[in-house]
UniProtKB/Swiss-Prot annotation:
Function (record text): Cell wall formation. Catalyzes the addition of glutamate to the nucleotide precursor UDP-N-acetylmuramoyl-L-alanine (UMA).
List of residues binding ATP: G117, T118, N119, G120, K121, T122, T123
SUPFAM superfamilies: MurCD N-terminal domain, MurD-like peptide ligases, catalytic domain, MurD-like peptide ligases, peptide-binding domain
Listed InterPro entries: Mur-like_cat_sf, Mur_ligase_C, Mur_ligase_C_dom_sf, Mur_ligase_cen, MurD
GO MF assignments: ATP binding; UDP-N-acetylmuramoylalanine-D-glutamate ligase activity
Gene: murD
EC number: 6.3.2.9
Intracellular or extracellular location(s): Cytoplasm
GO cellular component, one term: cytoplasm
HAMAP family cross-referenced by the UniProt entry: MurD
Protein's recorded name: UDP-N-acetylmuramoylalanine--D-glutamate ligase
A Gene Ontology biological process term: regulation of cell shape
Enzyme class: ligase
Length: 455
């Protein structure tokens, strides 16, 4: 992709902003950076990328597109909605609008293994990357997992494997993005404050497969209706995985063994008790990782080694410590009800559950119904506190308390807990009402738990 002397408008700096602008500068582009945050708020970011080749428009969107001159390309941060008036104005002018993932794809080489879904993306991405690395393949693990794709795009070669976690926000702005292997883990309502309807959300997720052909692979969850049904319309070769059923072909569990069945041969990979990551949802993640790595030539033996050694990832059912017989579990990545239901199912009862945060427009009824026989006390805080509290009472779960914030929740939970209990942070909500991201929320929880031991 030729960027030299091209005029590129970057809208929204966010996490991807610094590496994105650096790459554009390196490629010789003329850059305009537009962000709704002020120069004061972005001082550190601006210091990191400098002023050479860059014009900044901060604290507002330009009132008239014409004031920017002749634009060749617009690159959006994933957090910028496509339906705001300024973006609509750009669209009306016929200027190409892409996201960081699309730009990185155009600048990269190598086989792309792309993973999306409502839940399990980060764990599956990390696990898949570890299996490839353990099998001796030069592997980049990028995307929504923490390292922007654009940061590594120019380093990649034809022989590399690029494992990328992609969100629905990122998939809204792809055009040519073309994974060799694309995986849809599952789909349940999420981000409806952005996508408005489940149909729009589904459509964004399925963009993952839109440029695939018969030479590519779509890895699909047979147990998830959306993922399974998607297979009927996709051009790629379909590989299904299932935790609940034995398949004629695909990856599944048979007699407690993760099993690969091809047309020619069956491979018994590993006993599920040898996998360290907890929960039935993580078994599904392991099945998906098995399928993706096997497709690209990793042996059953190397897959087993990777599954056996993988410890899990931070903020996802992460064991923090045990104090006076009470286990503290950090599942800050539980940013929607489905993820938190899976955490409740995986954690050891009795559970004192800490939940709440920014509202994504979801319903908490199924979340509360999952408490039965598992949750002994619910502590809620944040923007969704009233909603969760009222939903709990409406569904006859009476042992619920509203608290000011996470710190008060941890202190109250310690006072309630008895030896043998689990204190589980699994908020079922986004973190943005109180924290910049779920990682910051999880780190704060771990710091609060550490302070309990010191006290």
């Amino acid at each position: 992709m030729e960027l030299k002397n091209k005029k590129v408008l970057v809208i929204g700096l966010a996490v991807t902003g610094v590496p994105l602008v650096r790459v554009l500068k390196q490629q010789g582009a003329q850059i305009i950076v537009n962000d709704m945050k002020s120069e004061v708020d972005l001082a550190e970011t601006i210091d990191a990328i400098g002023h050479e080749q860059i014009e900044y428009i901060l604290g507002r969107h330009p009132e008239e597109l014409t004031t920017l001159g002749e634009l060749d390309l617009v690159v959006l941060s994933p957090g910028v909605p496509l339906d705001i008036p300024f973006i609509q104005q750009i669209k009306a002018q016929g200027i190409e609008i892409i996201g960081e993932v699309e730009l990185a794809f155009r600048l990269s080489r190598g086989k792309i293994v792309a993973i999306t879904g409502t839940n399990g993306k980060t764990t599956t991405t990390a696990l898949t990357g570890e299996i490839f690395k353990g099998a001796g393949k030069n592997t980049y693990v990028v995307g929504n997992i923490g390292v922007p794709f654009i940061e590594k795009a120019l380093d990649t070669t034809e022989e590399d494997v690029i494992v990328i976690e992609v969100s629905s926000f990122q998939l809204e702005s792809i055009k040519e993005f073309h994974p060799k292997v694309g995986t849809l883990l599952n789909l349940t309502p999420d981000h409806l404050n952005r996508h408005k309807t489940i149909e729009n959300y589904r459509e964004a997720k399925l963009n993952l497969f839109m440029n695939q052909s018969l030479q590519d692979y779509a890895v699909l969850n047979y147990d998830d209706i959306t993922s399974r049904e998607a297979g009927k319309t996709l051009a790629a070769q379909k590989i299904y995985f299932s935790r609940k059923q034995i398949l004629e072909e695909g990856v599944f569990v048979d007699n407690q063994l993760i099993t690969i069945q091809t047309k020619e041969k069956r491979y018994d990979v590993i006993h599920i008790d040898e996998i360290k990551i907890l929960g039935q949802h993580n078994l599904e993640n392991a099945l998906a990782a098995t399928a993706m790595t096997f497709i690209l030539g990793v042996s059953a033996e190397d897959i087993a080694k990777g599954l056996r050694n993988f410890p899990g990832v931070a903020h996802r059912l992460e064991f923090v410590e045990e104090i006076e017989g009470v286990k503290y579990i950090n599942d800050s990545k539980g940013t929607n009800t489905d993820a938190s239901i899976k955490a409740i199912e995986a954690a050891q009862a009795p559970i004192i559950l800490l939940a709440g945060g920014q509202d994504k427009g979801g319903d908490f009824t199924d979340f509360v119904k999952a408490f039965d026989g598992k949750v002994k006390h619910l502590l809620v805080y944040g923007e969704t506190s009233d909603n969760i509290y009222e939903t709990a009472l409406h569904n006859n779960f009476k042992v619920v308390s509203q608290v000011r914030d996470l710190e008060e929740a941890v202190i109250r939970a310690k006072g309630i807990a008895q030896a043998g209990d689990t204190i589980l942070l699994s908020p079922a909500c986004a973190s943005w009402d109180m924290y910049p991201n779920f990682e910051a929320r999880g780190q704060h929880f771990k710091k609060l738990v550490s302070s309990l031991r010191r006290s």
